């Protein structure tokens, strides 16, 4: 493959009860970046619009787990979303990825970036950064 060949993107989801953070790779699937934060009840529609304009290879969705590895209370909602996506879009696989500690890492990243306390309290920003961390971790382990 030529180094300048455009590849389909990979999307990462930090699925929340109210809000969901999204991140996406660049066209070469090398660099992840924050995409958006959407209200969770609008996520499916948002992704359907996105795939109409961008080629997407797969979706990585954070699996909410407790520190001991057991599923958290949000896992059922994540599984429900995964199943709905698979039925509607079998051509774009969705796979779970351990998201333990991504919120902590997101806050640490924001501190290291020099963001002020007010910016770090922006939950939508934390969600996008968390999704970016999920995607970066996925890319580094594939």
Language model: regions and residue ranges:
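Phosphate- and other anionic-substrate recognition elements at nucleic-acid/protein interfaces
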Residues: 2-13, 17-142
